[in-house]
Amino acid sequence: MKNTLGISGGLAARFQDNALTPLLAVTAMLLGVFAVIVTPREEEPQIDVTFANVFVAFPGASAIEVENLVALPMEQVLAEIDGVKHVYSVSRPGMGVLTVQFKVGEPRTEALVRLYNAIFSNQDWRPPNVGILPPIVKPKGIDDVPIVSATLWTEDTARATQDLLKIAHALEAEIKRVPGTRDVYTIGGSREIVHVELDPQRVAGFGMTLDDLRQALTASNTVAHAGALVYDNTQVPVQAGTFLSNREDVARLVVGMFEERPVYLDDVATIVAHADQPDTYTWFATGPAAEEAGIDPIAYAPSVTIAIAKKPGTNATHIADAVIERLAQLEATLIPEGVNVTITRNYGKTADDKASKLIQKLSFATMSVILLTWFALGWREAIVVGTAVIVTLAATLFASWAW
C-alpha cells in the first residue's frame, strides 16, 4: 500500500535534499539577527490610541453657563463621530475642556480628520453674539508619553522655584537638539512676573490719569518693522521698539511729562518682581530606595520636572541615553552648583531590560526544547529540532520588524 504524504510531509520532502535549504536557513538566521539589532526598543507599544482635547473659551461665563452653552452641545456633536469610544467634559469659569477618546486601532490621521470635520462643520451650535471663541483642538497619542523625566531640585533656601524654572527652560533648548526628541516641556515652577501697584495720589500729583498710563504701557511694549537700510550692497532690516522683559525696563518706562521733565512709571507706582501664583506645586522627596540609587535622603525640596517625549518609531533606549548624557554635559555650564538633577523616569532602560529579558527567555525555551529532544530521541534529532526552532524564531522576528 502506497503512503501518501500530506502538505507538511511533501514540503519537508521537497526541501530535504535541496541545496537551497542550508542557504535559506542561514539567510533567515541573519535576517533575525538584523531584526533584533534594528528593531526600536520602546516601552509603549506602537498602536493607534488616539485622543484629543478640545478647548473652548467662554470669557466671563460661570461654570454652569459653560456647561449648558458649551460642554453639552459639544458633547452631542463629538459623540456622533464614527469610532469615538468616550467623550468627557470639564467645565470651569471661562473655559470648557472636552476629551475625545477613539477606539483602540482607529487610524490616527483618519480619526483626527473626522474630528476636525465634525467640529468645524457644526459651528452653528454656538449661540451668536455671546462671546464663545472658536474651539482649539490638541490631539494626543501614545508617542506623547514622556520616555525620560529629569527632576531639578535644590536644598538651597536662597533659590526659589522660578530660579529652577529658568534653568529648566534653558535646558529645554539644549535637549531639543538631541536627535529623536519630539516634545520637551517643564512641569511645575512659578514664572517671574512684574507687579505694578499704582499710587492714585502720585498719579494725580503728576496730572495723569489711568488711561494715560494704559496707553503708555501699550505703546511701549511693542516692536514694529521700520523699514530697511541699504549699505554697501547689503540690506539691513530696522526694528523699532523693544518688549518689556524685566523690572528695570518697566520701572524706567516714560509714561508722560510734567513740568518739562519725564515721568517714569516708578514715580507713580510701586514695582516689584516676584514669583507668580503657581498652577501646580511640585516637590522632590526620597524613599527607602534612595541610598541604593545614590541619592542622599531628604524630606522635601522644591523642584521642577523636564519631560521628554520621542518621535514615533525611534529607539527609546538610544534617545534616553543621549538625553541623559547631554544633561551630564550641561552640569558644568547651564546647571549651577547646588541644583541637583535626578532621572525620575527612564523608559529607555526599562524597554531595554524587557527586550533583553525576552531574548533570554526565548533562548532558555529553545535550549530546553533541544535538551528534551536530545534526552528523548538523540543528538541528531535534537540538532534538527533546535535548528528548526531557531530559524523559525529568527524569521518571525524579521517578519515582525518588516510588517
Task: Briefly describe each language-model feature range.
Residues 34-38, 367-403:
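Hydrophobic transmembrane alpha-helices and their membrane-interface caps
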Residues 1-366, 374:
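Membrane-proximal extracytoplasmic
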